[in-house]
Amino acid sequence: MSDEGSKRGSRADSLEAEPPLPPPPPPPPPGESSLVPTSPRYRPPLPAPLERIVGSGEPPVELAPRRKGEPLPPLPPSRLPGDQEVSAAGDSCEGPRRLPEVKLPEAAAGKGSPAEPEAGACREGERRGTGDQPETRSVYSSRSSSSGGSGDQRSGHQHQHHQPICKICFQGAEQGELLNPCRCDGSVRYTHQLCLLKWISERGSWTCELCCYRYHVTAIKMKQPCQWQSISITLVEKVQMIAVILGSLFLIASVTWLLWSAFSPYAVWQRKDILFQICYGMYGFMDLVCIGLIVHEGAAVYRVFKRWRAVNLHWDVLNYDKATDIEESSRGESSTSRTLWLPLSALRNRNLVHPTQLTSPRFQCGYVLLHLFNRMRAHEDVSEDNGSGEVVMRVTSV
């Protein structure tokens, strides 16, 4: 009993020692709403520019970020001017309302008010909210402009497809005049003159590779010596050219010496000497050999010269004339008559004679004999194959 009485006495003493609790604040008048909460909420300010947080007339003040575990600073006095309006509850950003003046201890007045960051954050949110609409408009305008640009690009491509272009460089008329040199039609109808001449020099033929039409060209003039280009020649052509050049030099020298020995008064003793008479005969025979060599190899050298001339001449390609083409085809005129230069393979193949086009009686007799021998050999092979029970067909070309 004494213990319980002592405990009750100590509890009563402690209750008397504690100060009394302050009375609750009076309710606000009906015209004003209680905007300041009993436990003030403090949110860390957003990283906004200093101009937005601080007024235009005050110097910028840097706000130190709150560290983790640090207690919240006390609420500073909200000493705002009478005409300044802020939004209630910093995160609601509703219509402008006035805050009632609340007096707080002076110790917390020097630490800065967190209401200003909240007001700045609210203004920043309002500015962001108001800035969303122009941004959306700009995005929409950029999309519309991009769609319009793509539409213009498509229309430009379609317009470009309708325009005639060169079938070699795929460029339009801005790179030069477009010609129609052959029977080709459609997208491969036109070409530039320079592109066609370069393609002819690279390909080595005056014939279109698509319609096999031989171009109508005319030579204008020779290029300048500084613009001359070399052509590719084979080893056989080099030997032929060297043989023709050396034979020509020997022929000129020997004929000059023979004429001087025959008509000069200073060569009377040479004409009477037997050794010089033998030399005259040998030189005459060598001159005949050189003449035959020049005649035999002169055609090949002349073809090489025509190729070189074709590369180093300025040519003019004419447009295709359908009436002229029909007239030439009706007359049966060969297109090789107007060919200025052909590749070596075409020139060599043109000189060959097909066995079905032999018109000489001598060639006809030889062809008949070869045909008879081949038929006899075919009969022997067939009889041997029939004995083995197998049928073999052999085709022999003559």
UniProtKB/Swiss-Prot annotation:
Zinc finger RING-CH-type: from-to: 158-218
Binding of Zn(2+) 2, residues: 182, 184, 208, 211
GO cellular component: cytoplasmic vesicle membrane
Chain span(s) of sequence motif PDZ-binding: 395-398
Keywords from the named record: Cytoplasmic vesicle, Membrane, Metal-binding, Transferase, Transmembrane, Transmembrane helix, Ubl conjugation pathway, Zinc, Zinc-finger
Function: E3 ubiquitin-protein ligase that mediates polyubiquitination of CD4. E3 ubiquitin ligases accept ubiquitin from an E2 ubiquitin-conjugating enzyme in the form of a thioester and then directly transfer the ubiquitin to targeted substrates. May play a role in ubuquitin-dependent protein sorting in developmenting spermatids.
Subunit structure, as described in the record: Interacts (YXXL motif) with AP1M1. Interacts (via PDZ-binding motif) with LIN7A. Interacts with unidentified fucose glycoproteins.
Protein name: E3 ubiquitin-protein ligase MARCHF11
